[in-house]
């Protein structure tokens, strides 16, 4: 399976809790496309983390967007508002974009605190006829990064169920060990390896165009974050946006440590856009969407030679590293804590930065390992169920750690003790051992100890 989908253009604030439920709604529409005449009502039940932090993450709204047949890439805030109003105030949805149905937001959208057995982010969608008979149903799991699997897919093949191999590939990459062996054999860096891998699924023109579109949108999101229409982020925290003021201050500073402020600016601006529900790039999740572009903006604005070609190499490297986390661990905060989101993004960015600065595959993987090693155990405890505190600032720290890890790996003379595959395995084990209160449920940590909210 191609790794390009590690980066997706969508809307905030969460890939697993916003994009995932929206995609589930889209998938259900496709499932019942030939039964529309029979359907009179739909009912959605959100479970586990989707329920516990669903309203703050807009999960309830997102599934409604999906059931209206809307897709994330082209979803504007104006369309969001129109569909929300129609569903909540007018009690109606345009099911699959083709049939108007009555929809009672209070009764047809159910928040259950129960957890479904296969994953922390579960949901069920049911369709009924005019007599109350069940027409169709499906159970979906939002497994992180905007990826969604049905219960049958998850039971059959676990996290790799969406990676059916239709043909024998010349290059198969399941972990960092295999990648390093191939790079050593062919004298490739990680960017070249990732490019050769993607050529098995796409033309060189398609790969280039996709990466440049992702990079263009990342820069657009940063600009929007420094030119906001509102001074405060949505939600009951009434959190003031900081990026605009931070940009004005760092532009005037002569502080030799000012580079840290620039990196923070890039990350905060993008993370604030995500928190507002605006367009962002999932990288590899929405909660961690600012880490990778912040490092790229640092390279573009503060180093020499970061061209479009280097940006493509950066993204190719990052998506390769991200695929190892997705295949062998998790990129879901609800499954493995924030280490799976910010940690994975920082690891991806570290390897990518090292690669575009000339590191071989071994040093790039060492950079990725160090970045994750120092995110191990990081909890996901969003205050008020919003992707704001501590999420926005964590993106800045993830970017700074990535840059530090890349530089440390490139100047290192000794042989690393820990491999990338070992730290990926450790992250996943740590996440599965972590108490559910600290995995995107807002039932522990800062989410309960911040007294001004609780």
Can you describe what each PLM-predicted range is?
Residues 41-54, 85-93, 316-327, 369-382, ...:
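Short, mixed-charge aromatic SLiMs
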Residues 201-337, 445-454:
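Accessory "access/gating" subregions that flank catalytic or transport cores
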Residues 7-27, 276-295, 338-346:
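Conserved phosphate/anionic-ligand binding catalytic regions in large, soluble enzymes, centered on
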Residues 16-33, 293-305, 350-358:
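Alpha-helical support elements that line or immediately flank enzyme active sites
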Residues 306, 317, 323-396, 408-417:
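Hydrophobic alpha-helical bundle architecture
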Residues 69-252:
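C-terminal regulatory domains involved in ligand/effector binding and gene-expression control
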């Amino acid at each position: 399976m191609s790794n390009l989908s590690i980066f997706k253009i969508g809307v905030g604030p969460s890939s697993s809790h916003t994009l995932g439920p929206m995609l589930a709604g889209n998938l259900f529409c496709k499932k019942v496309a030939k039964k529309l005449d029979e359907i009179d009502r739909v009912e959605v039940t959100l479970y586990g983390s989707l329920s516990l932090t669903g309203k703050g993450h807009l999960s309830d709204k997102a599934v409604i967007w999906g059931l209206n047949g809307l897709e994330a890439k082209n979803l504007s805030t104006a369309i969001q508002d129109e569909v929300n109003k129609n569903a909540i105030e007018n009690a109606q949805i345009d099911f699959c974009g083709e049939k108007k149905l009555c929809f009672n937001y209070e009764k047809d959208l159910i928040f259950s605190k129960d957890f479904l057995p296969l994953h922390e982010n579960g949901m069920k969608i049911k369709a009924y006829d005019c007599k109350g008979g069940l027409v169709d149903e499906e159970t979906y799991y939002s497994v992180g990064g905007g990826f969604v699997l049905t219960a049958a897919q998850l039971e059959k093949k676990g996290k790799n169920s969406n990676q059916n191999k239709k043909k024998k590939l010349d290059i198969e990459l399941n972990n960092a060990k295999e990648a390093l062996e191939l790079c050593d054999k062919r004298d490739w860096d990680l960017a070249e390896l990732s490019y050769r891998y993607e050529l098995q699924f796409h033309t060189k023109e398609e790969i280039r165009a996709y990466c440049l579109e992702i990079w263009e949108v990342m820069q657009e999101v940063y600009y929007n974050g420094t030119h906001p229409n509102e001074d405060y982020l949505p939600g009951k925290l009434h959190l003031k946006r900081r990026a605009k003021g931070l940009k004005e201050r760092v532009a005037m500073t002569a502080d030799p440590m000012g580079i840290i402020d620039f990196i923070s600016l890039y990350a905060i601006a993008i993370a604030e856009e995500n928190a507002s529900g605006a367009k962002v790039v999932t990288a590899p999740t929405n909660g961690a969407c600012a880490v990778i572009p912040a490092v790229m903006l640092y390279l573009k604005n503060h180093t020499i030679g970061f061209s479009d070609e280097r940006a493509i190499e950066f993204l190719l490297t990052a998506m390769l590293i991200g695929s190892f986390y997705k295949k062998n661990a998790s990129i879901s905060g609800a499954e493995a804590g924030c280490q799976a989101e910010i940690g994975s993004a920082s690891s991806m960015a570290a390897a990518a930065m090292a690669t575009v600065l000339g590191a071989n595959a071994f040093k790039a993987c060492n950079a990725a390992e160090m970045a994750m090693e120092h995110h191990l155990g990081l909890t996901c405890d969003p205050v008020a169920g919003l992707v704001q505190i501590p999420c926005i600032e964590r993106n800045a720290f993830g970017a700074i750690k990535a840059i530090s890890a890349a530089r440390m790996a490139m100047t290192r003379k000794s042989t690393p003790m820990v491999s990338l595959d070992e730290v990926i395995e450790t992250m996943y084990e740590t996440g599965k051992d972590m108490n559910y209160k600290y995995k995107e449920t807002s039932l522990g940590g800062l989410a309960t100890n911040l007294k001004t909210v609780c």
